[in-house]
Amino acid sequence: MTQVTVKELAQEVEAPVERLLQQMREAGLPHTDAGQVVTDNEKQTLLTHLKSSHKSKAEEPRKITLQRKTTSTLRVAGSKSISVEVRKKKVFVQRSPEEIQAEQKRELDERRAAENAARDKVEAEVRQRNEEQARRQAADSAVAAPAPAAKPEPAPAAAPAPVVADAPASEDAAARAAERKKDETRRNESRTRDDDRRRGEAPRVSIKVKVKEKEKAPTPRAAPRTTDEESDGARRGRGGKGKLKKRNQHGFQNPTGPVIRDVTIGETITVSELANQMSVKGAEVVKFMFKMGTPVTINQVLDQETAQLIAEELGHKVTLVSDTALEDSLAESLKFEGQTESRAPVVTVMGHVDHGKTSLLDYIRRAKVAAGEAGGITQHIGAYHVETDRGMVTFLDTPGHAAFTQMRARGAKATDIVILVVAADDGVMPQTREAVQHAKAAGVPLVVAVNKIDKPGADLDRIRNELSVEGVTSEDWGGDTPFVKVSAKMGTGVDELLEAVLLQAEILELTATPTAPGRGVVVESRLDKGRGPVATILVQDGTLRQGDMVLCGSNYGRVRAMLDENGKPVKEAGPSIPVEILGLDGTPEAGDELSVVADEKKAREVALFRQGKYREVKLARAHAGKLENIFETMGQEEKKTLNIVLKTDVRGSLEALQGSLGGLGNDEVQVRVIGGGVGGITESDANLALASNAVLFGFNVRADAGARKIVEQEGLDMRYYNVIYDIIEDVKKALTGMLGSDVRENILGVAEVRDVFRSPKFGAIAGCMVIEGTVYRNRPIRVLRDDVVIFEGELESLRRFKDDASEVRSGMECGIGVKSYNDVKVGDKIEVFEKVQVARTL
């Protein structure tokens, strides 16, 4: 509750402030001012004082009676049953404080008396044991000593004298020892009594025997049998071992307080693992999370902060550990030592689609790549290195289509210089602006190539203006970005462009260590039918050699072969050289870093660790979407979903298509890529599409014989594409068809009521003038009075000059009979309309 002041409390109880302060002083409260704060405890104290002062103290019940009734059924012979009702009654009486104190005092006195009695009993037993021991020693000495007739006295008097003298001293010492070790004495009490009984009885028998047979020498007494906890007697439970059985029981006791445990939490941890570390049931952790407002399951992955909060709330000590220890050890092992040398620049060509990026590269490489690409547009990242008169340059050609945003961002990260290609006749377009943003984010310099300068509509000043808005200012205008006019078709300005690029490279002073182990980045990856996983690698530092063990993201393997961009095998690749490598165990993600490691064991260990981490992150993301939106989606209509199984030729195209298709849809329809991969369409893909009612899409890949057979037998929808535009358009059409249609109303005509007639057949007939549109027979109508709809029905009769008419046009008079409606008045308007179904669009 919130705290209030004395003044606010006086207003609530409707009493003067002075009177309330007087009552608070009488109750012993320290308040003297109306602005002081009154706590809940002080309110309770004041209330108790007021009740006692008015002699209205609430009497608490001193006796509570609980009655419990249990009904059960007892079956008897003959399929009969008897209802048995058991009633129990318990009475709880509240005792006064005086009675409680008296009972506590009585219990304390009884406990002290019991302790004194136990102590006296122990002392008496010790005293008795010492006396018996003294008697036995006297008897033994009397039997062992000779008894001549001349001297009868010394024999009996020699032995007992020291025993009797030592008895009080040993008795006192034993008593003191017993007081110091009460617990040990009580624990060994039964065992000592049994030993004494055996030791006391055996010598008596031997004395009688030895007195009768004085000729025989006395035999030494056998050592008393010990009752060890581990002995067979204790285990088998022979006679007299009742107390020992109790000792042999385990000593576990329930903990009196909460057990605080040390919980070690990594970057992620599942609910079940966290519960195991805290030694509680998983259901308790789930229940605790529900109370915090977060629904979870026992297998859900929690992040480090959430797990730490749960463990600390439950009272345990938390130790946070980093899961990157393995990655850190790998980074330490990858040392780059050696002489640094200058390396060739890595240049990425970016720009809008159809602005001539690949054509410009074709002219530089003296190749014809653009002509061989589907639709004349680039859909992969291409990596090439070119020997020019001024040195070697490595080019990365990126797609310009909007779907390939991730590819362009990846190209900007792996590059040193960006060539921004802008068509002189088209100007700055959306992907041009995006390329500028990627270059700025990566912190790499720009060189603007104004292409298609030979076209009639070329306007260089317009491009400079538009790019200056994006923060790219030409050197001619006082900026730091070179603008070069080129024509990829004619070859104009290409030499000047290369010169500008190499000038930027000299300013950057790019260096590498060729003698170090290779390190690079994955530009693209695909699954080749004959060669397996193939990855395009751009070596950034060191030298990659055939036979090296490489770690690439969550994949690893030994480089079995290396090919350059022309498909020729090479043995090694230095800095800034793009190569294709074979030998990985899977297709790595584009953008993953590649490192040469020392041994296969280390590579496998790190790869498996990364795979597990990726799986945990994926599961956490999936669970977050499922459970957090449970209550939001409750009661809403379920979305219609178009399921797609997508197979592409390279990993980059798969990423681009998944991003583009996932962005389609609205609140009613959505696209879900339930299966995706690199390579041809296999039989398992067809079975997945069959089980999930999905459509099979192949992008630059084909289906094998097994998949085609399943598609034909089951009538699945399978389509092949080689241009990204086509697949996006087809999916849009499919989603539009799933939306259904909207019903739209078109007003056909409006008639105004001028007079009302009565007909024995139709009832009220409205004499109308058509003032707008055309009135049709057997169409739905609305009756409007003062422009407010008062009736909606159907036009039953339409006549003109006593003849039935199918339609009456504007400006003509007619008689209208409304079905099941007779309240037509002069001045009403009759609106005739029709309902039309209209196809919906995204």
From Swiss-Prot:
Alphabetic keyword roster: Cytoplasm, GTP-binding, Initiation factor, Nucleotide-binding, Protein biosynthesis
UniProt-annotated stretches for the region Disordered: 94-259
Region of interest (G5), ranges: 487-489
Renumbered residue ranges of the record's region G1: 351-358
Comp. bias regions, Pro residues: 149-159
Stretches the record annotates as G4: 451-454
Domain of life: Bacteria
Gene Ontology molecular function terms on file: GTP binding; GTPase activity; translation initiation factor activity
G3: annotated span: 397-400
Record-level GO cellular component terms: cytosol
Domain tr-type G intervals: 342-509
Keyword Nucleotide-binding applies: yes
Gene3D superfamilies according to UniProt: P-loop containing nucleotide triphosphate hydrolases, Putative DNA-binding domain, N-terminal subdomain of bacterial translation initiation factor IF2, Translation factors, Translation initiation factor IF- 2, domain 3
Region G2, annotated ranges: 376-380
Low complexity bias spans: 139-148, 160-172
PANTHER family, per database record: TR-TYPE G DOMAIN-CONTAINING PROTEIN (PTHR43381:SF5), TRANSLATION INITIATION FACTOR IF-2-RELATED (PTHR43381)
Record function comment: One of the essential components for the initiation of protein synthesis. Protects formylmethionyl-tRNA from spontaneous hydrolysis and promotes its binding to the 30S ribosomal subunits. Also involved in the hydrolysis of GTP during the formation of the 70S ribosomal complex.
Sequence similarity: Belongs to the TRAFAC class translation factor GTPase superfamily. Classic translation factor GTPase family. IF-2 subfamily.
Protein name: Translation initiation factor IF-2
Source organism: Pseudomonas putida (strain GB-1)
